């Protein structure tokens, strides 16, 4: 039985993780739950159903409610709670399903404590990939990617000779604005952007999907996850989202992972690896006609891919700056302060004017994160 700690349990990935736990109850024990959002009722329901021994919240009122209703549970606030949920002795695996870098210090402590890391938080690797890799090497941390694309690449690469890999290829659905003209893009609304044709995700990642910043972040994430210095990392539009990642080898052979666009597939793989179990979710129906399409990404229309490549070239502080600046610009778009087109325009300007420096500590990362947020709020 695996003993789990779940960061971001009320978010999309957190809820789906608990769905897998619910479907395979003999395999898992939920030791800790951490919530950053405002979904108090859902979090209380999760506590009642899964009976964790540790909970962490950011809302002070909810903290006192939990202490009153569940006196037997160790309840914590904010950073102290994340640390407890990351390092408790009985925990085997930490599922990092939160967004942003708020959980970064706790994730590092989990690695130091010898936990297996199920990483669904791409911002952590984008902002602190070099630091995470150093800690993973030092503490021999197993890191399993939960993102569907990186999970697919992981499965394709497992047991393979890294020197034989030519290219890692991530797929992108193209997002909700794939077929919009340049003129139409100038007038898209928040409601337009949040209507994703394939995936049901949180607002921030749905906006990132529309700008393809999400794919840029994933290119950076793939670099730090797999460390294949000689392999090219690229992305391609695949509207059906049935193939999630591909690995091309030196002989031209391509391996891919296929499943319906449902995060339950990669989540179950990570939670149950190295074994496989019957799933409550259905696979691809090959008895009906299926179409697989692939298109190159128009990098002039979507400069996010080029910006991501620049981040990988510069490394250092460019990763946390890129991530934090984009996050604020997305928040401003969702608040209807700026237009959709402004996200990439302003992000490009911020990146062009930013002077990169070596980023060697957690404190450096958090300082850059704070600076980028301030600049992105002002531009």
From Swiss-Prot:
<feature type="binding site">
    <location>
        <position position="11"/>
    </location>
    <ligand>
        <name>NADPH</name>
    </ligand>
</feature>
<dbReference type="Pfam" id="PF02670">
    <property type="entry name" value="DXP_reductoisom"/>
</dbReference>
<comment type="similarity">
    <text>Belongs to the DXR family.</text>
</comment>
<dbReference type="GO" id="GO:0051484">
    <property type="term" value="P:isopentenyl diphosphate biosynthetic process, methylerythritol 4-phosphate pathway involved in terpenoid biosynthetic process"/>
</dbReference>
<feature type="binding site">
    <location>
        <position position="218"/>
    </location>
    <ligand>
        <name>1-deoxy-D-xylulose 5-phosphate</name>
    </ligand>
</feature>
<feature type="binding site">
    <location>
        <position position="123"/>
    </location>
    <ligand>
        <name>NADPH</name>
    </ligand>
</feature>
<comment type="function">
    <text>Catalyzes the NADPH-dependent rearrangement and reduction of 1-deoxy-D-xylulose-5-phosphate (DXP) to 2-C-methyl-D-erythritol 4-phosphate (MEP).</text>
</comment>
<feature type="binding site">
    <location>
        <position position="215"/>
    </location>
    <ligand>
        <name>1-deoxy-D-xylulose 5-phosphate</name>
    </ligand>
</feature>
<keyword id="KW-0479">Metal-binding</keyword>
<dbReference type="InterPro" id="IPR003821">
    <property type="entry name" value="DXP_reductoisomerase"/>
</dbReference>
<dbReference type="Pfam" id="PF08436">
    <property type="entry name" value="DXP_redisom_C"/>
</dbReference>
<feature type="binding site">
    <location>
        <position position="13"/>
    </location>
    <ligand>
        <name>NADPH</name>
    </ligand>
</feature>
<feature type="binding site">
    <location>
        <position position="214"/>
    </location>
    <ligand>
        <name>1-deoxy-D-xylulose 5-phosphate</name>
    </ligand>
</feature>
<keyword id="KW-0560">Oxidoreductase</keyword>
<comment type="pathway">
    <text>Isoprenoid biosynthesis; isopentenyl diphosphate biosynthesis via DXP pathway; isopentenyl diphosphate from 1-deoxy-D-xylulose 5-phosphate: step 1/6.</text>
</comment>
<dbReference type="Pfam" id="PF13288">
    <property type="entry name" value="DXPR_C"/>
</dbReference>
<feature type="binding site">
    <location>
        <position position="10"/>
    </location>
    <ligand>
        <name>NADPH</name>
    </ligand>
</feature>
<feature type="binding site">
    <location>
        <position position="218"/>
    </location>
    <ligand>
        <name>Mn(2+)</name>
    </ligand>
</feature>
<keyword id="KW-0521">NADP</keyword>
<dbReference type="GO" id="GO:0030145">
    <property type="term" value="F:manganese ion binding"/>
</dbReference>
<feature type="binding site">
    <location>
        <position position="12"/>
    </location>
    <ligand>
        <name>NADPH</name>
    </ligand>
</feature>
<dbReference type="InterPro" id="IPR026877">
    <property type="entry name" value="DXPR_C"/>
</dbReference>
<feature type="binding site">
    <location>
        <position position="149"/>
    </location>
    <ligand>
        <name>Mn(2+)</name>
    </ligand>
</feature>
<feature type="binding site">
    <location>
        <position position="209"/>
    </location>
    <ligand>
        <name>1-deoxy-D-xylulose 5-phosphate</name>
    </ligand>
</feature>
<feature type="binding site">
    <location>
        <position position="149"/>
    </location>
    <ligand>
        <name>1-deoxy-D-xylulose 5-phosphate</name>
    </ligand>
</feature>
<keyword id="KW-0464">Manganese</keyword>
<dbReference type="InterPro" id="IPR013512">
    <property type="entry name" value="DXP_reductoisomerase_N"/>
</dbReference>
<feature type="binding site">
    <location>
        <position position="148"/>
    </location>
    <ligand>
        <name>1-deoxy-D-xylulose 5-phosphate</name>
    </ligand>
</feature>
<feature type="binding site">
    <location>
        <position position="39"/>
    </location>
    <ligand>
        <name>NADPH</name>
    </ligand>
</feature>
<feature type="binding site">
    <location>
        <position position="147"/>
    </location>
    <ligand>
        <name>Mn(2+)</name>
    </ligand>
</feature>
<feature type="binding site">
    <location>
        <position position="202"/>
    </location>
    <ligand>
        <name>NADPH</name>
    </ligand>
</feature>
<dbReference type="InterPro" id="IPR013644">
    <property type="entry name" value="DXP_reductoisomerase_C"/>
</dbReference>
<dbReference type="GO" id="GO:0070402">
    <property type="term" value="F:NADPH binding"/>
</dbReference>
<feature type="binding site">
    <location>
        <position position="121"/>
    </location>
    <ligand>
        <name>NADPH</name>
    </ligand>
</feature>
<feature type="binding site">
    <location>
        <position position="196"/>
    </location>
    <ligand>
        <name>1-deoxy-D-xylulose 5-phosphate</name>
    </ligand>
</feature>
<dbReference type="InterPro" id="IPR036169">
    <property type="entry name" value="DXPR_C_sf"/>
</dbReference>
<dbReference type="GO" id="GO:0030604">
    <property type="term" value="F:1-deoxy-D-xylulose-5-phosphate reductoisomerase activity"/>
</dbReference>
<protein>
    <recommendedName>
        <fullName>1-deoxy-D-xylulose 5-phosphate reductoisomerase</fullName>
        <ecNumber>1.1.1.267</ecNumber>
    </recommendedName>
</protein>
<feature type="binding site">
    <location>
        <position position="173"/>
    </location>
    <ligand>
        <name>1-deoxy-D-xylulose 5-phosphate</name>
    </ligand>
</feature>
<dbReference type="InterPro" id="IPR036291">
    <property type="entry name" value="NAD(P)-bd_dom_sf"/>
</dbReference>
<keyword id="KW-0414">Isoprene biosynthesis</keyword>
<feature type="binding site">
    <location>
        <position position="122"/>
    </location>
    <ligand>
        <name>1-deoxy-D-xylulose 5-phosphate</name>
    </ligand>
</feature>
